[in-house]
Amino acid sequence: MYKAIIMPVDVFEMELSDKAVRHAEFLAQDDGVIHLLHVLPGSASLSLHRFAADVRRFEEHLQHEAEERLQTMVSHFTIDPSRIKQHVRFGSVRDEVNELAEELGADVVVIGSRNPSISTHLLGSNASSVIRHANLPVLVVR
């Protein structure tokens, strides 16, 4: 089916990813690789240069925490763990999805989404932003 599948996840809101895991596995069934992507907010150190060292330590802590949670998430899959890669990046979800997709030559994005609320309709969501700006097919799982 698909060889490179990007699955953006929020490791601090795992329930959004549970259904998406099964769909990603289905799409990867013929030796595909699932690339879990967690995106942390872009660096605030540019505006807080007096506190740059503290901000950097905090970012390193967040990255380490995200990497640990991604590793835990791998256990939710039934496919061989060697076919699941983990990526933690800083920036906006939509930009990092497109950048990783280009780097990998990815085939599809699988993203979990919740039912829209009034705030989502007004402000948008990561899933809708990815859909609007993606350069490849996106499967949204609710």
From Swiss-Prot:
Family to which the UniProt record says this protein belongs: Belongs to the universal stress protein A family.
Organism per entry: Shigella flexneri
Annotated Gene3D superfamilies: HUPs (3.40.50.620)
Pfam families recorded: Usp
Gene field: uspG
Matching SUPFAM superfamilies: Adenine nucleotide alpha hydrolases-like
Name of the featured protein: Universal stress protein G
InterPro entries: Rossmann-like_a/b/a_fold (IPR014729), Universal_stress_UspA (IPR006015), UspA (IPR006016)
